[in-house]
Regions:
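Conserved beta-sheet core of the metallophosphoesterase superfamily
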Residues: 66-121
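Domain-core and long-helix interface of multi-subunit machines
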Residues: 31-79, 94
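General beta-strand structural signal in soluble alpha/beta enzymes
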Residues: 52-55, 83-87, 103-104, 201-205, ...
Length: 365
């Protein structure tokens, strides 16, 4: 028979997102050239006829610049592999040559990745192999009635849970307000974070790009708009200068220096969204890395150049802020582990050794 081998790899940048508490005893390395070594070994052991490499990584640009998105790097470099299946960056795309195909179906079940291999076998030996790949759009209207019936009770149970009342909201929350200054949405996250002893300052970013929750009864499903990601909360010791440098780095990711009202304050571009293909204005960088600070009184002068925009007046209680002093800063495990590069690039903090700075952490809030 035909031997089909599937080899899976997780993302080599996991240590840049998650607390070491979640991957203790594991190490991570680039998929290039490691994946080729694994492919060669497994093919020799399994006598594989067709090889599929499935990776939790994005497509990337194929220039070796992103350890988090090495799909195209593997597509260009792997030998003896028929299909590379990737995702993570939510960008639907297919790349093909005569000897290998890359499939990224995107996100939210908008498409299905579809690969075809045609083999010609003579006297038990494969004499030719033809590959093809495509994306099949998922038609929401074309429902499998039998599956719908089989899963109806499960669907209704989940729906009932997500509509369970969990509280009251006194004011409307618009996540988009966070891009232009103080907002009730991010202030809510800051307030929760600062409620965790011994936090004095909070870093937080808008985790939903353009969400809205109306004042009134809050249901469980609304929590996914407020905070869609699973994170732990870390309280990290930082100097005042490191805090300021992180804020400078963060604001430089999402605002421009302007001199008149005719200029764009936000770093946006009028280009098709690579994840959906929709033509719209969007941020140049990811909005979930647009950190602001709670527990501080500060201004952001948008007429000043990068590195000179943030003026910290005091702590929230009016006491002086000192760049040479140390403060306890609440942030997500994603940020503390290096996510968004804010700590590492902004303040030259070695996030591989973040445990040396953690004074408290909360697995659940």
């Amino acid at each position: 028979g035909i031997n089909i081998t599937v080899i899976g790899f997780t993302n080599p940048n996991i240590k840049g997102w998650l607390s070491p508490l979640l991957w203790e005893g594991m190490t991570f390395e680039s998929l290039v050239p490691m994946a080729q070594d694994v492919v060669d070994r497994v093919k020799a052991e399994e006598k594989s006829d067709v090889v599929i490499v499935a990776i939790h990584a994005g497509t990337g640009d194929g220039d070796g610049s992103s350890i988090e998105s090495q799909g195209l790097d593997l597509f260009k470099s792997l030998r003896g592999v028929d299909f590379v299946v990737c995702a993570h960056d939510h960008r639907p795309v297919v790349h093909k040559t005569d000897s290998i195909c890359l499939i990224n179906a995107g996100s939210h079940c908008r498409n299905l990745g579809f690969g075809t291999v045609t083999l010609k076998v003579e006297d038990g030996e494969i004499v030719s192999k033809t590959l093809d790949a495509d994306l099949l759009p998922v038609d929401k209207k074309n429902v499998d009635i039998r599956m719908q019936e089989l899963f109806h009770s499960d669907f209704e149970a989940v729906k009932a849970f997500t509509l369970k009342e969990v509280g009251e909201l006194k004011t409307d929350l618009r996540t988009r307000d966070a891009y232009c200054g103080m907002s009730d949405y991010v202030n809510l996250i800051h307030t929760l974070s600062l409620g965790c002893t011994p936090a004095q300052i909070s870093f937080a970013a808008p985790l939903t790009f353009n969400g809205f929750i109306e004042a009134g009864t809050l249901v469980y499903n609304d929590l996914f708009t407020i905070y869609p990601f699973e994170n732990q909360l870390f309280v990290v010791k930082m100097t005042g200068k490191e805090i300021k440098d992180c804020l400078e780095y963060s604001y430089d990711r999402w605002i421009n220096t302007i001199s008149s009202a005719d200029e764009h304050l936000l770093k946006i571009t009028d280009a098709p969204d690579p994840r959906t293909g929709q033509k719209r204005w969007s941020f140049v960088n990811r909005s979930y890395n647009f950190d602001s600070a709670g527990g501080l009184v500060y201004d952001v002068d948008v007429t000043k150049p990068s590195g000179k925009r943030v003026i910290i007046r005091s702590l929230a209680d009016g006491s002086p802020f000192d760049e040479s002093a140390e403060y306890n800063v609440a942030m997500t495990s994603y940020r503390a582990s290096g996510g968004g590069d804010i700590l590492r690039e902004g303040a030259c903090i070695d996030t591989d050794r973040i445990a040396d700075r953690v004074v408290e952490y909360y697995p659940e809030i």
